[in-house]
Amino acid sequence: MNAFFEGVQCSLINFNNFAKNYYTFLLKKFCLDGIFMNVEEMERKLKPKGEVSIIGCGRLGVRVAFDLLEVHRGGVEKVYVFDNAKIEENDIVHRRLGGKVGEYKVDFIKRFFGNRVEAFRENITKDNLHLIKGDVAVICIAGGDTIPTTKAIINYCKERGIKTIGTNGVFGIEEKIKVCDAKYAKGPAKFLNLDEEGHIVVGTEKFIRDFEPITPYTLDEIAKRMVIECLRILWSKYYKS
């Protein structure tokens, strides 16, 4: 009799151990499956969304384009690039990225990124503002008096709900890059004389009269900050729950 009960007790212990192990296995399996399903679902949702116009594809604009279009698991779906200039020998960053001398800067960006880019061999002026489209316009125009054109772009975009990001000085040897609303800018952007908030500017706050150079590492950092601000706008519109 004792042997019988000992056998039953041993069987129960073995069954309990088996049940415990099987329960642990099922728990892990279903938990892991649930996690994997959630990750896959989130990955499907993190598709590129929104459209951005990059106005000017010189040394700064091309950096913005490449940084923005390299973003994955989200980011921008379509980019419109505007510039009528061709790559020259001194356009080091374009050549370093694979551009060819004599090639239109916008065509180079289009060639690199394909259908995600629509290229316009035109400079944006007061006469063709209607070409600007999307959720955000990043203004990277340079050379001469850019204030009138920049202000026209800002006003046009504001009327249509397009957010704008621009520069506030690109000169400087070792300057901290600052981001602020143009209404409160202390650098070149203050000459926009904007009465209302909404136009974001990024830069060193240095003027050409400061007689400091434009360095590649400064442009890298300005482009980085511009892309961050652009992504924040897109995230707030398309991803924020």
UniProtKB/Swiss-Prot annotation:
One of the Pfam families matching this protein, by short name: ThiF
Chain segments annotated as coiled-coil in the UniProt record: none
Stored InterPro entries: ThiF_NAD_FAD-bd (IPR000594), Ubiquitin-activating_enz (IPR035985), UCP006529_dinclt (IPR012028)
Annotated signal sequence range: none
Single GO MF annotation: ubiquitin-like modifier activating enzyme activity
Gene3D superfamilies, per the entry: NAD(P)-binding Rossmann-like Domain (3.40.50.720)
Protein name: Uncharacterized protein MJ0693
